[in-house]
Amino acid sequence: SLQSLFWNQLFLPGKDRLNESSLRQFNVNLQSSGTTTPVSLHQGNMDFVWNADKQNGTIGQTTVSYRSQQHGNSTLTWLYSNFTTVGVKSFPAKQSFTFTTTATRQKQTVQATLDMDEVTTKDNWEVNSTVSSKYKKIETKDILAKIMTL
């Protein structure tokens, strides 16, 4: 999921790749006003919204929200800009993300910006990689539970 956010892609939590049947889980609001079309996904306590440009399909903003009476509310907002061509794809050379949570009993916010001067790749480089087996999967609820103990 984090890799998909960085690469400015739609994703389904827990899935490595999207296929035609998985795309049916997304809702698209083609009647939206403005320059973007919201693509949304609801999964349990989490909501995902990707705002795609109506002209070229690039995602300008992704918002991931987690709501829980027990763990509070958390929101990740990821903004994309300064798109540049990398091979045949458009890549956001500037990315800003803000994470806000009440899981710590008081509202806390962290913000980071990646502003890349140049984006290049080498030939034969695999865009989609897999996480090494030495790492174990940690569920969102477990991360929030750890934050709660801070």
Please describe what each predicted stretch is.
Residues 124-150:
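Gram-negative outer-membrane assembly/targeting C-terminal domains
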Residues 1-15:
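Acidic/charged, solvent-exposed loop-and-adjacent secondary-structure segments enriched in E/D, K/R, S/T
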Residues 19-20, 24-133:
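Gly/Pro-enriched, hydrophobic low-complexity segments
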